[in-house]
């Protein structure tokens, strides 16, 4: 990934109005992508977006660029990222494009691509698009220009797909669920999925205004969800992020249930049902408690680099079907091709109904180790903090103190100028002190 100029671990992302997220760049990106994708056959592209106000501007720019390259665009309107992957597959489009910055604030946005089979674009295609960006934009002949259309039943198609991943013999009629859509792309999808399966749904974070996506709601801030679950005496709460590829849950006591715990529940249920193929994939950030709990069940566990594309690569390498990040990206390859918050949450709720257990009890077989994450902003060009000798020395001291009862991880964010410092161990006070000691060394580097 290091030789890329524009593409990061999750497409192209940045602040709207600053390079590269400008109308001029996105128009050129649409054209370059069109030139590359036109070589492959079909000339139709699916374009979806989340609820950010900048989505209107950027989809227009993308459509202009694609049209200039001779490709037609079909718009879904606000639609979860996994829905665009699904629709790309079912419409047999050449590619799908999502305009979203996922869990980031409204003033950020991004562009990510899906291939014809609903997976992230291969590295070589992204590199070919970057190479095309360096060329001068030329427009095809007027008779060859692409057209624009709208997919009017996109939401209904995806709702039916999601419901189809929930077992027919089960019903949610006895459950009260608070659903938090982060004022994002799932706002008109997720509440309907759970209602149509019989649940009593209380919806929050379902009033997008273009500016309030992920603002004190959704998977990255579950405080409003926790409060509402307790106030409503609900059975559980489910929070999605702005583009619906992440899910975090809340049990009836208001406790947060993260991606590691969701992976544990789904893996254990797969084992019970005789449907688990191989093991489960987590990441370098996955809690040690997950690894130990799966080991006790005899379920193999492997760690991938952080990023859902790396979880997917590890699953494909191992021939396994389920993987997740603790942030709530859950990939279930027997159901879909990419992280899907709604589909993942349905599998957890199915386990609750089938086993007549609440979410709190489903998690009880896994003891979470205290894990402290500190984000340190750094300035590009000042040198690599991860190569600093003092940082290395402090990290070595902490690792020696933890021994085999904990872990230390330092890594750069794939989407922001941040160093993420993670320390995990048995004692929360000790882990917190160690994390801040390393973070201070990174700041001073």
UniProtKB/Swiss-Prot annotation:
EC number(s) from the headed UniProt entry? 5.4.2.10
Q: Which PROSITE patterns match?
A: PGM_PMM
Cite a GO CC annotation: cytosol
Give the active-site positions.
Answer: 102 (phosphoserine intermediate)
- Assigned keywords, A-Z: Isomerase, Magnesium, Metal-binding, Phosphoprotein
InterPro entries named in the record: A-D-PHexomutase_a/b/a-I (IPR005844), A-D-PHexomutase_a/b/a-I/II/III (IPR016055), A-D-PHexomutase_a/b/a-II (IPR005845), A-D-PHexomutase_a/b/a-III (IPR005846), A-D-PHexomutase_C (IPR005843), A-D-PHexomutase_C_sf (IPR036900), A-D-PHexomutase_CS (IPR016066), Alpha-D-phosphohexomutase_SF (IPR005841)
Q: Which cofactor does it need?
A: Mg(2+)
Q: How is it modified after translation?
A: Activated by phosphorylation.
Q: Which GO terms describe its biological process?
A: carbohydrate metabolic process; peptidoglycan biosynthetic process; UDP-N-acetylglucosamine biosynthetic process
Organism superkingdom:
Bacteria
User: Residue positions of the PTM Phosphoserine?
Assistant: 102
Q: Which EC class does it fall in? A: isomerase
Free-text remark on how the cofactor is bound: Binds 1 Mg(2+) ion per subunit.
Q: What positions does the entry give for Mg(2+) binding?
A: 102, 241, 243, 245
Provide the reaction this enzyme catalyses: alpha-D-glucosamine 1-phosphate = D-glucosamine 6-phosphate
Coiled-coil positions are: none
Q: Which CDD domains match?
A: GlmM
The protein's GO terms of the molecular function aspect are: magnesium ion binding; phosphoglucosamine mutase activity; phosphomannomutase activity
Pfam families, per the entry: PGM_PMM_I, PGM_PMM_II, PGM_PMM_III, PGM_PMM_IV
Q: Does the keyword Nucleotide-binding apply?
A: no
Which family, according to UniProt? Answer: Belongs to the phosphohexose mutase family.
Q: Which PANTHER family would you find in this protein's record?
A: PHOSPHOGLUCOMUTASE (ALPHA-D-GLUCOSE-1,6-BISPHOSPHATE-DEPENDENT) (PTHR42946:SF1), PHOSPHOHEXOSE MUTASE (PTHR42946)
Q: What's the protein name?
A: Phosphoglucosamine mutase
The coding gene here is: glmM
């Amino acid at each position: 990934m290091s030789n890329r100029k524009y593409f990061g671990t999750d497409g192209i992302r940045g602040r709207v109005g600053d390079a590269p997220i400008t109308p001029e760049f996105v128009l050129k990106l649409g054209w370059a992508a069109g030139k590359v994708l036109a070589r492959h056959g079909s000339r139709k592209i699916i374009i979806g977006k989340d609820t950010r106000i900048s989505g209107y501007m950027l989809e227009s720019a993308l459509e202009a660029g694609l049209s200039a390259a001779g490709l037609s665009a079909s718009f879904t309107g606000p639609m979860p990222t996994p829905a665009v992957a699904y629709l790309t597959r079912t419409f047999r489009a050449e590619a799908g494009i999502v305009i979203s910055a996922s869990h980031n604030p409204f003033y950020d946005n991004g562009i990510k691509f899906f291939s014809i089979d609903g997976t992230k674009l291969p590295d070589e295609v992204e590199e070919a698009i970057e190479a095309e960006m360096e060329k001068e934009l030329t427009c095809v002949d007027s008779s060859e220009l692409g057209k624009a259309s709208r997919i009017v039943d996109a939401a209904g198609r995806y709702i039916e797909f999601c419901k189809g991943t929930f077992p027919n013999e089960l019903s949610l009629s006895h459950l009260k669920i608070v659903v938090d859509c982060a004022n994002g792309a799932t706002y008109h999808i997720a509440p309907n999925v759970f209602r149509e399966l019989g649940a009593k749904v209380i919806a929050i974070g379902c009033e997008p205004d273009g500016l309030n996506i992920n603002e004190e709601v959704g998977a990255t801030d579950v405080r409003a969800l926790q409060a509402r679950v307790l106030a409503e005496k609900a059975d559980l709460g489910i929070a999605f992020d702005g583009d619906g590829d992440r899910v975090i849950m809340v049990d009836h006591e208001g406790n947060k249930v993260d991606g590691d715990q969701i992976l544990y529940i789904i893996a254990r249920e797969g084992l019970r049902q005789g449907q688990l193929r191989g093991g489960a994939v987590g990441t370098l950030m996955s809690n040690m408690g997950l690894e130990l709990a799966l080991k006790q069940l005899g379920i193999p566990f492997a760690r991938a680099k952080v990023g859902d594309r790396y979880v997917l690569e590890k699953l494909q390498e191992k021939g396994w079907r389920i993987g997740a990040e603790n942030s709530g990206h859950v990939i279930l390859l027997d159901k879909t091709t990419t992280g899907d918050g709604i589909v993942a949450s349905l599998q957890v709720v199915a386990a609750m109904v089938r086993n007549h257990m609440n979410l709190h009890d489903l998690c009880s077989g896994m003891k979470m180790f205290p894990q402290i994450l500190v984000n340190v902003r750094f300035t590009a060009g000042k040198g690599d903090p991860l190569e600093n000798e003092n940082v290395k020395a402090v990290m070595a001291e902490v690792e020696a103190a933890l021994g085999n009862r904990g872990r230390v991880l330092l890594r750069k964010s794939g989407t922001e100028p941040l160093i993420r410092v993670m320390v995990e161990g048995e004692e929360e006070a000790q882990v917190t002190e160690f994390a801040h000691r390393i973070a201070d060394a990174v700041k001073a580097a």
